[in-house]
From Swiss-Prot:
Residues 211-222 have a biased composition (Basic and acidic residues). Residues 1-138 are annotated as: Modulating. Homodimer. Heterodimer with a RAR molecule. Binds DNA preferentially as a RAR/RXR heterodimer. Interacts with RARA. GO terms for biological process: positive regulation of transcription by RNA polymerase II; retinoic acid receptor signaling pathway. This is Retinoic acid receptor RXR-gamma. Residues 21-33 have a biased composition (Polar residues). Composed of three domains: a modulating N-terminal domain, a DNA-binding domain and a C-terminal ligand-binding domain. GO terms for cellular component: cytoplasm; nucleoplasm. InterPro entries: NHR-like_dom_sf, Nuc_recep-AF1, Nucl_hrmn_rcpt_lig-bd, Nuclear_hormone_rcpt_NR2, Nuclear_hrmn_rcpt, Retinoid-X_rcpt/HNF4, Znf_hrmn_rcpt, Znf_NHR/GATA.
Length: 463
């Protein structure tokens, strides 16, 4: 099992040797260590006693240069249970003390590789039994797992919440028994009086709850002030005014339909969009701070978002139309006409993802104006000289819209998020429309950039 270690020990001639062997004979380490007397007490022992190697390089073993692995292990663990009995008269003592020096000279526990089947010294794990570490993980009130220090005491989420509710609501409890009920993980809800008293006894502080409430109130007020300062700089009233100023008069167009026109739906939509480009520039000028941007950036923003801006407008205008859209020219394009013209798929998306959603949530003009302003202030538009300024303006519109929905629709806390969810659909539909509407490159014989530049340089007409 342990191999041949005859070069470590020498024993009397004739003992255990093969026939004809007259020199010193090796002895198994297990037999040697099972005896009780020193090796040199035997009369025939003539060689030097066993000693640990002094240098690692002098040892001719493959096991980490520690000499016999049997010595290293048995010095700490004792002889193995399967040790062979030594013949009478041969007694050996335990390994000399010098062997301990060999073990202690090992640089780390990784240098000691145990024999197969024996655990490594460095892999022994001992659980921590420090009282302090246990207290931090146990609720001082009920003994459940602690989630941290709450109101001065390590406690679980249940006891933390119970104490906070008691203080904030100023609750008063009574005990049905003798005010000495057991409060533990299983029975903590049985008696609220005793549970609250134990919270106090263990050190929970009433003032800590009150201070937490005060901090929350101050933080909410601070956030409200920040939001207020944001939307005061981008008043929703001015955004609504911009929408109303360019709103086409379509009251008398309700009875008109596609049959009144000889053109196909795509041509009619193009003509309507052509007309709306003029009013779109007027609308943008009325949006707060848009005119403060450089003229080049104004052109870039309108060119990047015109399709989405127009689609949002006629989609909201069409919420009162049955299964179709109402153009700014007053024409009503029905779903069947769009399918006949080969644009049914994109037309259906406009109806289901925009018109229907706007109708379901009853989106008002102020919300529409804010969504369009968010589209207008696109900091990702290519070529902007100052994208960060545009992004700041967009964030102000976000703040204005959020404040408006909270004030106007307090019973709908998710309304702001619902409004923003229309923007990805608007972007996707806008990109798809460009495949069908080719008019955007030219306004008659005028390139769109030149047209927009001329429109933006024209003074705003206040009506």
């Amino acid at each position: 099992m342990y191999g041949n270690y005859s070069h470590f020990m020498k024993f009397p001639a004739g003992y255990g040797g093969s026939p004809g062997h007259t020199g010193s004979t090796s002895m198994s380490p297990s037999a040697a260590l099972s005896t009780g007397k020193p090796m040199d007490s035997h009369p025939s022992y003539t060689d030097t006693p066993v000693s640990a190697p002094r240098t690692l390089s002098a040892v001719g073993t493959p096991l980490n240069a520690l000499g016999s692995p049997y010595r290293v292990i048995t010095s700490a663990m004792g002889p193995p249970s399967g040790a062979l009995a030594a013949p009478p008269g041969i007694n050996l003592v335990a390994p000399p003390s010098s062997q301990l020096n060999v073990v202690n000279s090992v640089s780390s526990s990784e240098d000691i590789k145990p024999l197969p089947g024996l655990p490594g010294i460095g892999n022994m794990n001992y659980p921590s039994t420090s009282p302090g570490s246990l207290v931090k993980h146990i609720c001082a009130i009920c003994g459940d797992r602690s989630s941290g220090k709450h109101y001065g005491v390590y406690s679980c989420e249940g006891c933390k919440g119970f104490f906070k509710r008691t203080i904030r609501k100023d609750l008063i409890y009574t005990c049905r028994d003798n005010k000495d009920c057991l409060i533990d993980k299983r029975q903590r809800n049985r008696c609220q009086y005793c549970r609250y008293q134990k919270c106090l006894v263990m050190g929970m502080k009433r003032e800590a709850v009150q201070e937490e409430r005060q901090r929350s109130r101050e933080r909410a007020e601070s956030e409200a002030e920040c939001a207020s300062s944001g939307h005061e700089d981008m008043p929703v009233e001015r955004i609504l005014e911009a929408e109303l100023a360019v709103e086409p008069k379509t009251e008398s167009y309700g009875d008109m339909n596609m049959e009144n026109s000889t053109n196909d739906p795509v041509t009619n939509i193009c003509h309507a969009a052509d007309k709306q480009l003029f009013t779109l520039v007027e609308w943008a000028k009325r949006i707060p701070h848009f005119s403060d941007l450089t003229l080049e950036d104004q052109v870039i923003l309108l060119r990047a978002g015109w399709n989405e801006l127009l689609i949002a407008s006629f989609s909201h205008r069409s919420v009162s139309v049955q299964d179709g859209i109402l153009l700014a020219t007053g024409l009503h394009v029905h779903r069947s006409s769009a399918h006949s013209a080969g644009v049914g798929s994109i037309f259906d998306r406009v109806l289901t993802e925009l018109v229907s959603k706007m109708k379901d949530m009853q989106m008002d003009k102020s919300e529409l104006g804010c969504l369009r302003a968010i589209v207008l202030f696109n900091p990702d538009a290519k070529g902007l000289s100052n994208p960060s300024e545009v992004e700041t303006l967009r964030e102000k519109v976000y703040a204005t819209l959020e404040a408006y929905t909270k004030q106007k629709y307090p019973e709908q806390p998710g309304r702001f998020a619902k409004l923003l969810l229309r923007l990805p659909a608007l972007r996707s539909i806008g990109l798809k429309c460009l495949e069908h509407l080719f008019f955007f490159k030219l306004i008659g014989d005028t390139p769109i950039d030149t047209f927009l530049m001329e429109m933006l340089e024209t003074p705003l007409q206040i009506t």
